[in-house]
Every structure is written in C-alpha cells, then in structure tokens.
Amino acid sequence: MSPRVYRISVLLSVLLAEVPVGTNLGLFWLLWALISGRFLLSRGAVFPALAAGGLAADAVRRSGAALAYGRWAVQPLVRAWQQVVEQEGRWRAHRYEGFRPVACDLVGFFRPHLSGCVGKHYQSGAAKALPAIVFAVVAAVGLVGKVRLPLLRLVLRADPSDCSEAVLQRRALRQAGAALQSDEVLVVDAGFGLADLLTEGVPCFVARVARNFTARG
C-alpha cells in the first residue's frame, strides 16, 4: 500500500470511528469511491461507482444499504473532519483586518427526473431555476500551504415538508450565525436577503447587494 493510500485510509477510519459497526465499513467504501472520482465516471450512480472500485457484488449491496438505511448523519462526520484538520495544525484561516471569513451559500445538484423532495435552484447556463436537490453549505476560508482549502463546517438539506430555498437559507443563517466566533464574519452573496441576516441574528456579516441598494442605520 502506497503512503498516500495508507494516509487516506487512516483519515477515513478516524472520521468513521463513531459510526456503528457495519455501517462504518459501508460508508468507508462510499467515501473511497467519492475521493477516487468514480462517482464522476458513473454520473452519480452509486452501485456502478462502487463496483468500479473492485468491490464484490455483495459488498456493493452492503455499502448501498449503509448509505440508504445505516445509522449515520452528515453533521457528525463534518465535525470529525473539522477536528482532524484543526488538530494537525497545517490549515490556516484567512484573516482580513483581524476577521476570519466564513462563507455560506446554497448548492444545487440538478436532478430533473428525480421524484420526491426536489426543490429548484438557479442555473446560470439555463438562465432559470431548475429542479434540484439543494444544500446549504457553510465553510471557514483558509489554506494549507499555498493551496486554498475551505474547511467545511455545516451541511444542511431542505426539510422534506418544505423544499423552498428561502426556508433553507434562514436555517443556514441561524445555525451559521450561532456558531460564529467573536473574530469571524459570515460572507454571503446576493441571494441572501439583508432582512434575513438581521432577523436570524447573524452578529457580523458581509453581504453582496444590488448597486442601487439603500440602507438607513
């Protein structure tokens, strides 16, 4: 096993240490397929991506079952990743005038033929909103060496009972704002309303607004 492969295996094992036995192995192979780029080759299809990695058919089925029915959640994995990166001490947060930026945005995975909880997300190429599974992503901005690396902090999916982006945005702002340190500032683009930033109690933020924006303090 090459040092790089061994290193990735150790990191994945640390991230999955608190996941129940059985589910942890299934997620290990899923994350390995994701890191290796096999999901790009399979266009997001789970079973072909796993099979392309050389897994036996029964291992592919167990890994797919871990994804769909296993006892796990995204946020504990995100927290584990954040702790690992910070403990290694190589990641450095960007600072501007003493403040550390924390970015917040919505990301859409476009699935026009998927049934179920599918919202809509604006796609610039189509110049309109298209059916998509929408996530809110919050990440601290920093670098490792000379390479910029966002340190993921929060991943939220729309509530199945209400897939609107507006509701998801407010949830993201509320949770991201509550987790900000005294020297951190939340950075959002024009898709986030100033009223929502204030209503959800974000203590410090930088927002992109329209050129003709007017405010009164």
Located regions from the model:
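Generic hydrophobic, aliphatic-rich segments that mediate packing or membrane embedding
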Residues: 45, 59, 98-102, 134, ...
